[in-house]
């Protein structure tokens, strides 16, 4: 008799996605981050739901409602810090997941890659809005600075900013709409994740060698479910260590001060996971140019499949491309460090050099190195 999981319409869907899914036998731990991102999303939605039960999205009460959650709600301090540090872990997994896609050439699955980029944008937007909700100094000024970038758009910029703010400055209407969107977007992210998986399962997973693996597949369960559970346990160990031993390690002390429109913090900066893009924004002296560079720093990912000149999919056997890949990673780390520094010499110069190197590496050096490698292997 055929198993229920193979006949029941709902079970069949789960079976084809998580149990009998044919998976390459040689995928490494770098393929764990997809499931970890799913775990992050579940953690964020769950903790966020409990926080929303006690949060008040109004400029006069938001800050005190956060204090109330931390002090008076049972395990409120833990739920709050799990949510804040969960966002940091989410972005660590996200960056590693994208990095793996770049290294092993997973971007050749176009629909999966492009939905992934939309997911990245949506997650960044959700995280930014979440950062505004505690209504501390950095929340308020971060919201003011970043939303103000819309004013760089010709003709409609100023009207657009006032429309987003719901007034002539960041105030209660801004906070209310940001809370509404911050609550709603994770469910859109969940829907996009389902699409991402749907398109991935159309083509099947890539593997470290970058070659077709149709002749050598194994079932997802039990082999990769066990592997993913191990990854999940290590992830939870890191998250709980961060949350319980050093909950404020990645947050800004200024956010423990109530938002004050009359007092500007000495150094306005976003959360650490946006610092690389913030550094690129600040490295351009012109406002519109900076906004365009900021958008392009993420949108450049859409050009990667078109810039892929190599005859090999993966970088496993391409030492020249590997060198440029790690140069790009080092460059992004420098940009992240610079984004947290004040706007003064020598940081301005470093950020301009690092930003130029970022775009040059992706647009020119990597395609050129691929062509050189093809020529060296006489694959031209």
UniProtKB/Swiss-Prot annotation:
Keyword Heme tagged: yes
Membrane topology summary: Multi-pass membrane protein
Cofactor: heme b
A Gene Ontology term for the protein's cellular component: respiratory chain complex III
Domain of life where this protein originates: Eukaryota
Chief location category: mitochondrion
Keyword annotations from UniProtKB, A to Z: Electron transport, Heme, Iron, Membrane, Metal-binding, Mitochondrion, Mitochondrion inner membrane, Respiratory chain, Transmembrane, Transmembrane helix, Transport, Ubiquinone
Pfam families: Cytochrom_B_C, Cytochrome_B
SUPFAM superfamilies reported for this sequence: a domain/subunit of cytochrome bc1 complex (Ubiquinol-cytochrome c reductase), Transmembrane di-heme cytochromes
Alphabetical GO biological process terms: mitochondrial electron transport, ubiquinol to cytochrome c
Cofactor note: Binds 2 heme b groups non-covalently.
Any one GO molecular-function label of the UniProt entry: metal ion binding
Residues annotated as binding heme b b562: 83, 182
Record: residues binding a ubiquinone: 201
Chain segments annotated as transmembrane: 33-53, 77-98, 113-133, 178-198, 226-246, 288-308, 320-340, 347-367
Residues reported in the UniProt entry to bind heme b b566: 97, 196
PROSITE patterns for the chain: CYTB_CTER (PS51003), CYTB_NTER (PS51002)
Cell compartment(s), UniProt: Mitochondrion inner membrane
Coiled coil: none
CDD domains for the chain: cytochrome_b_C (cd00290), Cytochrome_b_N (cd00284)
Oligomer status and interactors: The cytochrome bc1 complex contains 11 subunits: 3 respiratory subunits (MT-CYB, CYC1 and UQCRFS1), 2 core proteins (UQCRC1 and UQCRC2) and 6 low-molecular weight proteins (UQCRH/QCR6, UQCRB/QCR7, UQCRQ/QCR8, UQCR10/QCR9, UQCR11/QCR10 and a cleavage product of UQCRFS1). This cytochrome bc1 complex then forms a dimer.
Additional remark text: Heme 1 (or BL or b562) is low-potential and absorbs at about 562 nm, and heme 2 (or BH or b566) is high-potential and absorbs at about 566 nm.
Family: Belongs to the cytochrome b family.
Physiological role: Component of the ubiquinol-cytochrome c reductase complex (complex III or cytochrome b-c1 complex) that is part of the mitochondrial respiratory chain. The b-c1 complex mediates electron transfer from ubiquinol to cytochrome c. Contributes to the generation of a proton gradient across the mitochondrial membrane that is then used for ATP synthesis.
Record-given protein name: Cytochrome b
Organism placement in taxonomy: Eukaryota, Metazoa, Chordata, Craniata, Vertebrata
Gene (UniProt): MT-CYB
